[in-house]
Amino acid sequence: MRGLRPALSTFLFLLLITGGVYPLLTTALGQWWFPWQANGSLIREGDTVRGSALIGQNFTGNGYFHGRPSATAEMPYNPQASGGSNLAVSNPELDKQIAARVAALRAANPDASTSVPVELVTASASGLDNNITPQAAAWQIPRVAKARNLSVEQLTQLIAKYSQQPLVKYIGQPVVNIVELNLALDKLDE
């Protein structure tokens, strides 16, 4: 019975710290230092939320740049179904999926002259990735240019404008946020 009081006191103290103080402190610091990120990095147009800069969207039309395949197949880019998605390299099912994706991309992009970029046929670890390389975006330019009646030069400039360089020059690679790029495409039509 003598050991119950210190154990209960320790439990209540840790419950207060880990269940109250720590979450409130991290929430307050996040809101103070990173308010846009702490609130989901939402992309707004007026009062309308168009998406998040952190989660891809399912752009399927020929007039849009397509991102990486979503691992959440039933409802693409569903964050509630996020999780590990890639099959092992030795799994024959992966070969079938990639072959089907390559065939679909080739059919949708008949004017593309080089091989299909790897990130357009492989899902990311979360299945929600919103970024592709500028080269993968450039590969899709002929299809998007034809569908939107835009020049290759206009789309090349748009990709360059929305390309983000890595924080450290030699670590990582440049990426293009597909959500922001496609929203910018829609603004060109206005």
Curated annotation (Swiss-Prot):
The keyword Zinc does not apply. Keywords: ATP-binding, Cell inner membrane, Cell membrane, Ion transport, Membrane, Nucleotide-binding, Potassium, Potassium transport, Transmembrane, Transmembrane helix, Transport. GO terms for molecular function: ATP binding; P-type potassium transmembrane transporter activity. Its main location: membrane. It is found in: Cell inner membrane. GO terms for cellular component: plasma membrane. The chain crosses the membrane at residues 10-30. It is a single-pass membrane protein. The keyword Cell membrane applies. Part of the high-affinity ATP-driven potassium transport (or Kdp) system, which catalyzes the hydrolysis of ATP coupled with the electrogenic transport of potassium into the cytoplasm. This subunit acts as a catalytic chaperone that increases the ATP-binding affinity of the ATP-hydrolyzing subunit KdpB by the formation of a transient KdpB/KdpC/ATP ternary complex. Belongs to the KdpC family. The system is composed of three essential subunits: KdpA, KdpB and KdpC. PANTHER family: POTASSIUM-TRANSPORTING ATPASE C CHAIN, POTASSIUM-TRANSPORTING ATPASE KDPC SUBUNIT. This is Potassium-transporting ATPase KdpC subunit. It comes from Escherichia fergusonii (strain ATCC 35469 / DSM 13698 / CCUG 18766 / IAM 14443 / JCM 21226 / LMG 7866 / NBRC 102419 / NCTC 12128 / CDC 0568-73).
